[in-house]
Amino acid sequence: MAIIPDKQDSTVLERKQQKLKPPSMYKVVLLNDDFTPMEFVVMVVQEYFKKDRETATQIMLKVHREGRGVCGVYTRDIASTKVEQVVTHARQAGHPLQCVMEEA
């Protein structure tokens, strides 16, 4: 804020407008491995990314064929939480599934 004197010996505060920019977005990406069952990947995509079965299957096939598949794009905190949830669930189930986040 800037202080601007006016003509009557009083002070008026002038508020400067701040330009807000949208938050940085991050892709959550599943990486292929030779051990995690395809059905487990589909279940993870449905549970943590709220995709229907058909979409989850398409993402799983992309991971299987191309080595990686994007599950969604989120703000940093949400993407980080989803990565942590997926990796934790995979480890608890005994699978080496990898999930990472990348700047979109």
Swiss-Prot record:
One protein family per Pfam: ClpS
GO biological process, one term: protein catabolic process
Residues annotated as signal peptide: none
Matches recorded under InterPro entries: ClpS, ClpS_core, Ribosomal_bL12_C/ClpS-like
Superkingdom, natural source: Bacteria
Quaternary structure (record): Binds to the N-terminal domain of the chaperone ClpA.
Family according to the record: Belongs to the ClpS family.
Function of the protein: Involved in the modulation of the specificity of the ClpAP-mediated ATP-dependent protein degradation.
Name the record gives this protein: ATP-dependent Clp protease adapter protein ClpS
Organism per entry: Burkholderia multivorans (strain ATCC 17616 / 249)
Gene of this entry: clpS
